[in-house]
Every structure is written in C-alpha cells, then in structure tokens.
C-alpha cells in the first residue's frame, strides 16, 4: 500500500493525542523516512484513513545507541540517520512509534497492527537481514503494555523525557515472531 504525505499528517495528529510536542516527529520528516525506506511504516486504515501505525526504523548503530542511552529522541531522527546499507539493514531496529487513534482503540485494531507489523518484519528477515537488537521508546502506559505484552521487549532505562526504553536481542525477537 502506497502512503501519501496526507497519511503522515494524520499520523502526526494521532501522535499529538498521546505524546508531548517534543516527542512527536514532524510529518515531513517521517514522510522522508518512508520515501527513503518504504519498510519504515506500517499502517491500519479504515475507509482509507490511517487509524493506527508503527514506525519501524533501521538506524545506524551510533544513532541507535544515542536513542538507547537517552542522548537523542525520536523527534531528532533525520533521514540521514537511517541505515539503508543492505549489509547492515535492520541490524538495529527501532520501534519509534506505535499509535492508535483514540477513536479506534480496540483489540481488533491492535491485533491487526501487530499482525501486519510482524509479517513485514518476517518478510524482511527472510530476505537475509540480521536483527541484532530491537528497541522501543514508550511514552505512555498503553505503549509500555503493548511493548511488553505483545513485543516482549524488556524495560531498559527511564529517559529524561519521561518515557521508558525497552530492548530485546534480535534472536529473541525473531523467535517470538515465529511463534
């Protein structure tokens, strides 16, 4: 499914339902991520409107570590921070946003989003990409619940912007996806 800039405007609106402005990636930058790497965004639509989405960023190792150790947050990530080199693609995977429109927050939408996301990641791994580590930065209790319950990522550290970094080894994550 091809996404448009208007889809990213809607995603930014969804973000503002939950996250403080300083933690929201601007639609124009998120759209650049998508244009550089179409695998970076998975959406659920209802009547052609985005109602839920996940940003899955393949980050350069040094950028990944800056996010992991609270030296940088999602809203500062630029398209130049993405790892697009085929030999290193998806080594350091960052779930930068998992968000569902407040009018569509139900288990069906969540399961659909997780299912589509899992299939996308498995498809990429089956093309020969090696995931070394997976990370999510959770700003809400709901995000922490999704990250821990469905993605099985483990709490790593609290950030200066009131969120919690969660991580999991790539091997553990791949094993989980195949269950």
Segments from the language model and where they lie:
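Short amphipathic alpha-helix that is part of the acyltransferase structural core
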Residues: 1-28, 36-58
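Terminal substrate-recognition subdomain of acyl/acetyltransferases
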Residues: 1-3, 98, 102, 122-179
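Alpha-helical elements of Rossmann-like donor-binding domains used by nucleotide-donor carbohydrate transfer enzymes
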Residues: 10-14, 29, 112, 116, ...
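Catalytic micro-motifs at enzyme active sites that drive phosphoryl/nucleotidyl and oxygen chemistry
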Residues: 29-32, 40, 81-84
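Short, high-confidence coil segments that cap the C-terminus of an alpha-helix
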Residues: 39, 90, 127-131
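Short beta-strand micro-motifs in enzyme catalytic cores
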Residues: 40-42, 91, 161-167
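Conserved acyl-donor/pantetheine-binding loop and adjacent beta-alpha core of acyl/acetyltransferases
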Residues: 55-97
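Conserved acetyl-CoA-binding loop-helix of GNAT-fold acetyltransferases
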Residues: 97-100, 105-123
